[in-house]
């Protein structure tokens, strides 16, 4: 049965034609674009309809690397011939773009047509660009449908997209025409682009990585989609006041999002609470509870110089209309009447809601399950539709790859099992086989204590059927562990079970408990005499040594990319592991033994990811080794084939080509081609020109032009004036103790103190002028991080108003750091700081962006720093600090009172306490760097340990900067050595080695 479906060319009247309903619910067919250009006769109706009919009948000639010729041949030779004569892409001219913008300015309902000011100009321009995306967006989806290719689905709680306008027209190669069109309308493209708010869908590198990956997937023509949540208020907007950081709700959706298409026809039910019952057929049924609807919002993601345009599908949540209690409302009980609606909508209010309360924890778990459930229902519906009349579930892993970006989407595993078993009727064995072959997991965490865990009681209440499935998976794992290690050594088996089980502090199922009890009894009887002889002091010593041995395994770490507000919990876990929590042992008064608290039952999400997926990858070489040797060592020994490395990358389109056009032109001029944008290996050709004076002159001019722009931006944003002739020294990333902004600002304080001790001539001779720029958000409940923000701003307020110092030193904290601010700062940067405690950063991606833009780096051997230093050359990287393998030993020395602080470090602390930076009490902040034990003390992140080498390294920075020819050469070599860190390379590796997908290119 045919239905009337609307198919559109972006610059034409909507064309109504009778086509099969194929895909109208789950694809893009049916989206109503605006009629724009028929009124101006730019594109003829008949040619538009002919092109649309061609798209409907079959798709396009295709380049496909799968090697399966039978799938890739287009059978209809007539359509093939027509494809040769059809335009391969849409390239509007300036006149048609002007007409398009005018149309949207008049008919877009967000604004009054009486005015055409900058906000209206942005919305109208964005909608015009979106129209240009629709044709490729539909064609890409249609072709995936036709070929039924294997498709990757990237699930992430964050997508930090940044502004979309310049990126979209850049990828479409329409920057020039749009700039000219807006000029004819009396606007500058740059001014219009600045009206766009950053999409508040992420916070840190976790979300930015996901967005870079989408750009690369589209550019490289891989069949893939992203799935996330549509947060109404984002994480928060950061304001800096005299009291430090203040958080307010993001307002990025205040004027709507012109890039998204609301898909009210694509929604899925998501259930919470309820109970599990067994039906007459013996099957489990999850019934009752609270139902909400997840509604799709689609955002087209264009590739660079390709027709491929993939999709980012974001879910919003709402309650069904029948959930509104009309009787209660009419009775005056308005809050009660709309309670269900409010409960549903708040799931997607903010990213990472505070989880100190049970309500906050519940909301976070609801967010994670909503993402997983709605996305999997959508994926499965697409698989079934593409499969046609006969669905073979064994083919599911051959058509679908699901990548979990960190542990937030872990519930994909039990949810896929639930759907396959309870709804599709598969056996446990078949469902488990399919799930393991479909799902893969990216780890971003190097500290075992930071791995996500959920209360089993909470999960059992909220998702009762999923807990049953997780318990069964845990039983499968127990069987595997027993089969691997046997029962002869009960202590070893017990250790492995405690380390590897998905459920923590949960008793073994009866069948396994009996095995262990019998084994333990046999072992105890056979060794009874030996045990008696070893009672007493020896036993205590053995226990002590065992504890130290466990400590030796620790490398330390924090959550790599995302900031989900777990810092306080992680710090407590660290303290407990180190034995630095205050204890009553040694209290001289005898006390009655306190009852031992029952440890909470927990679900270890990372363990579930490892068990339930077919691949586990780290995000930098050193991180992947830590994952194998420490974080998941027991699993690595059991399944070494699962573990891989996929060093992160960033898209060179956004992070050089579009954000740094001056440098891009220079690179193209000297390499002789723009191919480096798609093939970054060509950047290495810059090495042979590194000493060329003409290139160096151009390089410095481009850098200074960017610095002038940043100086104007800083004056507007912060009120501080800076000199573009100073060195721009930048540290921008979320505020966290392990990232050590405190080390940076302590170094600045030391520099300031030394300046104050000199006369003007001495200061000028001994110090290179610097502008020290900070940016990043502290999580709202992370008190120590917020103290660091306050301290930085206090130092800046003092230093920047000191007439004796002038332009020799400025300290600027940029509020509300985001992608757009990064695109401004990174091209202007000359030194960037990546100074985390060694072994605690999984990878990092900002270091890659800085390197691409010719910025020198000072840092530790941590995360991707290790590989960046290898690629750019050790002589072009300022290295300092302890190595990862030394960290545990240094902490032990501190605990034993062997650490002797550097006098310069003590000097800085005393200077801060003198009140020179204001009356704020910094005892808590400085106290965290003092003492040898105690929670929140003992300098866990080794600021004092690395302070001397950091200062000495900064002296080397000053020395190098004075020789501008040498510095410029180093800068060029950083760009030349950054080719490895393109997200294109990373995506190729994922596609080949984890997802098993091939490029599919529309022509």
From Swiss-Prot:
UniProt cross-references to PANTHER family, sorted A to Z: ALPHA-GLUCAN PHOSPHORYLASE 1, GLYCOGEN PHOSPHORYLASE
Gene: PHO1
Gene3D superfamilies referenced in this protein's UniProt entry, alphabetically: Glycogen Phosphorylase B
Keyword Chloroplast applies: yes
Domain of life: Eukaryota
Lineage: Eukaryota, Viridiplantae, Streptophyta, Embryophyta, Tracheophyta
Name by which UniProt lists this protein: Alpha-1,4 glucan phosphorylase L isozyme, chloroplastic/amyloplastic
Transit peptide endpoints, chain numbering: 1-64
Catalytic activity: [(1->4)-alpha-D-glucosyl](n) + phosphate = [(1->4)-alpha-D-glucosyl](n-1) + alpha-D-glucose 1-phosphate
Entry's transmembrane regions: none
Cross-referenced SUPFAM superfamilies: UDP-Glycosyltransferase/glycogen phosphorylase
Tissue specificity comment: Found predominantly in cotyledons and early seed coat.
UniProt keyword list: Allosteric enzyme, Amyloplast, Carbohydrate metabolism, Chloroplast, Glycosyltransferase, Plastid, Pyridoxal phosphate, Transferase, Transit peptide
Region of interest (Disordered), residue spans: 71-91, 526-593
Biased composition (Acidic residues): 537-553
Stretches with biased composition (Basic and acidic residues): 569-580
Entry's localization field: Plastid, Chloroplast; Plastid, Amyloplast
InterPro entries listed in its UniProt record: Glycg_phsphrylas (IPR011833), Glyco_trans_35 (IPR000811), Pyridoxal_P_attach_site (IPR035090)
GO cellular component: amyloplast; chloroplast
Modified sites of kind N6-(pyridoxal phosphate)lysine: 849
Co-factor(s): pyridoxal 5'-phosphate
GO MF term (any one): pyridoxal phosphate binding
Entry EC number(s): 2.4.1.1
Role: Phosphorylase is an important allosteric enzyme in carbohydrate metabolism. Enzymes from different sources differ in their regulatory mechanisms and in their natural substrates. However, all known phosphorylases share catalytic and structural properties.
NCBIfam families reported in the protein's UniProt record: P_ylase
GO terms for biological process, alphabetical: glycogen catabolic process
Protein family membership: Belongs to the glycogen phosphorylase family.
Organism name: Vicia faba
